[in-house]
Regions:
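N-terminal targeting leaders
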Residues: 2, 8, 13-178
Length: 178
């Protein structure tokens, strides 16, 4: 019975998210399945999973890889894993070579993402803009922005992200509606 309740809660949550999303329901589900599959494959690769930190974000078939690996070869391997899945339209590999990120840095990144998302709620004057359509992910102070947005929306989102204290750099991974 608990499993059914969890499934119903997940479905209700997903339905609420999809209401605001410019992607189709099928695309949202496909993105989630792709993300989970790629993460699983990376975690099953013992060399990639050990002493490396790779995060995967998928939006509209575009895969963003961020984090750190100990070698460029491992970064390339993570990219190859992602490219091996049907439905992947493009892979953006932003994995850096270097030591694994500390837990404290990860917490700071989550706070930074929250600050940027909060700032997006202040965007007014753009007809139809919904800040929930923008995916904000932060790694080592670098903010990655994904979503299906207009050029005007993208410019405002980037402007707000850059103005957020603590942001080192902003990387656009948008797809444009116009």
């Amino acid at each position: 019975m608990t499993r059914i309740a969890a499934i119903l809660l997940a479905a209700a949550t997903l339905a609420g998210c999809i209401f605001h999303d410019r992607r189709s329901f099928g695309s949202v589900i496909d993105d989630q399945n792709l993300e989970l599959s790629i993460i699983d494959s990376i975690n099953r690769d013992k060399e990639l999973a050990l002493k490396n930190h790779v995060e995967v974000v998928v939006y509209n078939g575009v895969v963003l890889l961020i984090g750190r690996t100990s070698t460029a070869e491992l970064s390339a391997r993570a990219e190859q894993v992602a490219m091996g899945y049907q439905g992947v339209r493009r892979v953006v590999n932003e994995i850096e070579v270097g030591p694994r990120i500390d837990v404290g840095d990860t917490t700071s990144d989550k706070v930074l993402s929250t600050r940027v998302k909060t700032g997006l709620a202040d965007i007014v004057g753009i007809k139809g803009f919904d800040p929930t359509r923008v995916n904000v992910t932060t790694e080592a102070g670098v903010v990655y922005l994904m979503g299906l947005v207009s050029q005007e929306e993208a410019e405002r989102v980037v402007e707000i992200a850059r103005a957020t204290p603590g942001v080192q750099r902003v990387v656009r991974v948008f797809e444009y509606t116009d």
